[in-house]
């Protein structure tokens, strides 16, 4: 509308004005894409999920915004495959891990994604939590900021990491068929 007023005032040739208007057309208002995922929450009666959406930083160009050695296709394949497993994503704070995860959620639209705080794994020994996880079969669970589990396993007993490995690689993992994608705010 601003351009329209400006052009009408400064041009007597309306055909030229229309050409200029076509050239300076505003972008569509809704250019953002939306991703949908579920947040795992603890309640008084157990565990449940709440649907969440995000529309920020989804349409990123992986080749343009990340290093050449980023294995995006491997992360995508991991999220789309059938089975259990564990994938790790390392990077300093602000390096784009969360944006990359949103891109994965968008690109793998046939996969169910759940966001879970890593501390919830403390509940893994409870039958109630295991029953809850059975309801999430063939999904990807994303846990961000897992760096505190990087303690040396030979000097400290770490039941959380042992439970995570059991869920993703043991017989329990075969039954659950869940893949975990964990991020760490650390450089390799």
Locate the predicted segments by residue:
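AAA+ P-loop ATPase mechanoenzymes
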Residues: 1-70, 77
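Signal for well-folded cores of large energy- and translation-related assemblies
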Residues: 76, 80, 109, 134, ...
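Walker A/P-loop nucleotide-binding motif
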Residues: 82-100
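A conserved segment at the C-terminal end of the G1
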Residues: 102-108
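Short glycine-rich substrate-engagement loop in P-loop NTPases that contacts/grips substrate
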Residues: 108-136, 158
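Loop/turn-to-beta-strand initiation segments
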Residues: 111-112, 136-140, 174-181
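Walker B catalytic acidic pair
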Residues: 144-146
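Conserved catalytic/switch belt of AAA+ P-loop NTPases
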Residues: 148-188
């Amino acid at each position: 509308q601003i351009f329209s007023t400006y052009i009408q005032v400064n041009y007597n040739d309306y055909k030229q004005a229309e050409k200029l208007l076509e050239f300076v057309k505003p972008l569509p208002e809704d250019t953002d894409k939306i991703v949908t995922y579920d947040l795992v929450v603890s309640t008084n009666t157990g565990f449940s999920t709440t649907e969440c959406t995000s529309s920020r930083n989804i349409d990123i160009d992986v080749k343009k915004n990340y290093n050449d050695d980023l294995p995006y296709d491997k992360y995508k394949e991991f999220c789309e495959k059938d089975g259990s497993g564990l994938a790790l994503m390392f990077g300093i704070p602000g390096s784009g891990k969360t944006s990359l995860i949103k891109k994965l959620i968008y690109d793998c639209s046939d996969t169910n994604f759940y966001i879970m705080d890593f501390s919830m794994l403390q509940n893994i020994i409870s039958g109630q939590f295991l029953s809850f996880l059975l309801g999430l079969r063939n999904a990807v669970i994303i846990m961000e900021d897992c760096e505190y589990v990087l303690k040396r396993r030979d000097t400290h007993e770490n039941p959380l990491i042992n439970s995570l490995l059991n869920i993703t690689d043991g017989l329990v993992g075969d039954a659950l068929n869940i893949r975990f994608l964990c991020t760490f705010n650390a450089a390799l």
